[in-house]
From Swiss-Prot:
<feature type="binding site">
    <location>
        <position position="74"/>
    </location>
    <ligand>
        <name>[4Fe-4S] cluster</name>
    </ligand>
</feature>
<feature type="binding site">
    <location>
        <position position="203"/>
    </location>
    <ligand>
        <name>[2Fe-2S] cluster</name>
    </ligand>
</feature>
<dbReference type="GO" id="GO:0009102">
    <property type="term" value="P:biotin biosynthetic process"/>
</dbReference>
<keyword id="KW-0808">Transferase</keyword>
<dbReference type="InterPro" id="IPR024177">
    <property type="entry name" value="Biotin_synthase"/>
</dbReference>
<keyword id="KW-0004">4Fe-4S</keyword>
<dbReference type="InterPro" id="IPR007197">
    <property type="entry name" value="rSAM"/>
</dbReference>
<comment type="function">
    <text>Catalyzes the conversion of dethiobiotin (DTB) to biotin by the insertion of a sulfur atom into dethiobiotin via a radical-based mechanism.</text>
</comment>
<dbReference type="InterPro" id="IPR010722">
    <property type="entry name" value="BATS_dom"/>
</dbReference>
<comment type="similarity">
    <text>Belongs to the radical SAM superfamily. Biotin synthase family.</text>
</comment>
<dbReference type="InterPro" id="IPR006638">
    <property type="entry name" value="Elp3/MiaA/NifB-like_rSAM"/>
</dbReference>
<feature type="binding site">
    <location>
        <position position="71"/>
    </location>
    <ligand>
        <name>[4Fe-4S] cluster</name>
    </ligand>
</feature>
<dbReference type="InterPro" id="IPR002684">
    <property type="entry name" value="Biotin_synth/BioAB"/>
</dbReference>
<dbReference type="GO" id="GO:0004076">
    <property type="term" value="F:biotin synthase activity"/>
</dbReference>
<keyword id="KW-0093">Biotin biosynthesis</keyword>
<feature type="binding site">
    <location>
        <position position="67"/>
    </location>
    <ligand>
        <name>[4Fe-4S] cluster</name>
    </ligand>
</feature>
<keyword id="KW-0411">Iron-sulfur</keyword>
Amino acid sequence: MTINPDDLCRRIMADPEACATEDEALRLLELPAEQTLPLIACAQRIRTAHAGPAFTCAIVNARSGRCPENCSFCAQSAHYATGAPEHPMLNTAALVEHALKLADAGADRFGIVTSGTRPAPRELETVCEAVVRIRARTHLSPCASLGQLSPQAAAMLRQAGLERYHHNLETARSFFASVCTTHDYDEDIYTVKLAREAGLAVCCGGILGLGESRAQRAELSGQIKRCRADSVPVNLLTPVAGTPLERMDPLPPFEALRTIAVFRFMHPQADILVAGGREHVLGEYRSWTFISGANGLMVGNYLTTAGRSTADDYTMLRHMGVLR
């Protein structure tokens, strides 16, 4: 059955609680190529009507490498010889120093990210101490991505003043076993649930281009919707030498932009943040992310790969009229 993106757009525009279903999302994803630009234009209208203001997010790789998980895309997995940087947990002072530099660069949000399945008690204390100091010394909204949480850990982070917890599902449940076999999909959903129950905003997304089907992209977006994500980060695979996906072909740029647009149809009011891989996949179309429905951008470096110049990103956003 065909679908008219403009009709669906009007329905969502008229009702802030309306959104595309998984079935509608798949039909949008399977529209012929000549419908891509009208689809993107509709996503832009939905973003303008329902999403929050544009924002930027920056991260620090607080503990790098030696992760016991075997995620097939990840440079930090101990299962693969990738040559990625390895270092133990940064101390509180170093985390605050990174935050100060990124605040000066203009970031709105700051994420503390660690490799590994879950944080050790002392690492959790370090993050909590850093969050307190970052809130006292900067305008940044502090976030953390530390792996799986316990109820006690989630409560500690919230008490310290953390605003948002990031935990990706990575891909659809039906494709997850092709990506990771060292933990179960439901463990990730449980961590997202614990973060929300602790009073934290939830940042939950995934990676496109792992070999999943369009139907599985719609499935992932539907699961994120059921997790009630406040922010949806969209990463685009950058193949890493030494990982099982090192020879994966990149998504075509307009396939990636079309998927971002469809995510906006499914998440009209959520923040949609385009993060890792945009330089590799989108190339000259990297400025199209906001036109395609996103309202957030990760700036600066990623976990193990260099990002675009922060100054260049802010210049691009100002020229687009997204930021002043």
